[in-house]
Amino acid sequence: MGKAFATCMDNFRRWFASPKIYVVFVLILIMQDSMMIAPIRRFARDMNLGVAPWIYPFLPMDWYICMLEAVGAIFLFCDSPMVNAGTPYLFMRTGRRAWLGGQIMYVLLAALAYQILFLLSSVLLVLPQLEFTPQWGKTLGSLAQTNIGYWEYGITLSGSLVRRFTPMQAMALSFSLRWMVTALLGMLLLCMNLFLPRVFGMIAGGAIALLHPTAINASGTFLYYISPASWTALDYVNVSGGSDTSAMALFPDLTYIRITGMAILLALILISFLGFRKKSIYSLSTT
């Protein structure tokens, strides 16, 4: 466990010298601010209102933000497992299983860091108007339950989210689902990169990212069941299970999403360990 953790931390240390990490950070800030948070700030300023720190669960409701969040995760994990000139020496020092365990640990923790970055930036970007309240607040409530945001500021927030969840419920559920999907994308790339040129992993990840807008524009709800990115948008998650008789009953329920997502995640981890048993570290693709 100690050697796996050391391998994981070695990957994180490379973040400071990686331009890719800074690109992902800037992408997150620009994406959130331009597509959702800047209009919320303008509304709050014009109405002389504060903004509650609960924007995070609204973000994936915008299909473009949802898709770009998946693309950012693909960009973050496209070079997993991290291989450079010193990797063979680290591999010999730690051992095969510990090295791969460290790579998997890195994916899980980096997915956590990725979502923490989304959450913190959604709060920091409204600092001038930030208002601490356990409720949704007047700004988010007004934008979610009226059309004033659409006509005056070009933004619409989910009224369904406000009606179905308290802020803390929405934050906790959104964070857990988005971490799971980010980790799933990371493990898919890691698993495929162990055995195939890295371009194939990026193609597979890109296909998953594009499933969400495809599901929105398709007739029926079948694609929502096979689109992990869609599972991060709570408007497309049936939290009531079989007891829901509304239109929400057509969407995948929370139990299905959790079981399916974790099953895929564990399957990818198992495939990685089993398939890597006799693979040479020198055979790993870096392109």
Task: Locate predicted features.
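Aromatic- and glycine-rich beta-strand/loop motifs that create alpha-glucan
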Residues: 1-27
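Interfacial transmembrane-helix starts/ends
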Residues: 8-12, 16, 97-109
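Membrane-helix interface segments
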Residues: 19, 95-97, 197-203
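Central hydrophobic cores of alpha-helical transmembrane segments
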Residues: 24-29, 200-213, 231, 286-287
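Secretory targeting signals
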Residues: 32-80, 101-190, 194, 227-260
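Transmembrane helix segments
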Residues: 35, 196-226
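Transmembrane helix boundary and interhelical loop/hinge segments in multi-pass membrane proteins
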Residues: 76-92, 96
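Junction motif at the cytosolic side of a transmembrane helix
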Residues: 191, 195, 262-287
